[in-house]
Amino acid sequence: MEETLVFVDEGFLARLSKYFGNGKYIKFDKISFIKNIAKKKDLFVKHTFYATAPPFQGTPPSEDEKKRKEGYDKFKNKFSNRKDFTFLEGRVQRTKNKEGIFQYRQKGVDTVMTMALSSFRADYPTIKKIILIACDTDFCPILEMLKSKGIEIILASYYERKRNTEFSRSHHLIDCSSEYIKLTKEDFLNFKLEK
């Protein structure tokens, strides 16, 4: 099997699992999920780059924030000894909206993913195909650059034609890719973890 690298936007993956779980996150084996996406294209995962952000921590952190951080650290530690898995970390920003309600947004996650996409050839010069699990059109410039250098981009994402839905994004990211795999609920359920 030909080797590939997989680049994962965890924020997108989490939103999609919640969407397919009808408002509840589907807990699933991420490594098996990623390997299965590659297997659909007869590819072997050489390395995964997983872009995420640790949960927001106030000063001092609340009990809920501490609990979220413990869960994140436990999740991250599961992968810390794997040589085929790299965490790319941004941060979470907390702001208040006009109604005084806190809102949380990931910051820098797309940037660290773009950095990894732009530099992987130094460590993996023989890779000719990569898989991107994301939905953000901000990745189009780097994808276009990679395609111009002979890299095939396989986008694994979810897109709906219905306007004003959570996944009714621009078709532009699909157009920037070489191939498109539409993720399904079954992709998650096939690797569902029991509590």
Predicted regions and their residues:
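Nuclease catalytic cores that cleave nucleic-acid phosphodiester bonds
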Residues: 86-195
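Domain-level signal for Mg2+-assisted phosphodiester chemistry and nucleotide/NA-binding surfaces
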Residues: 1-105, 152, 159-162
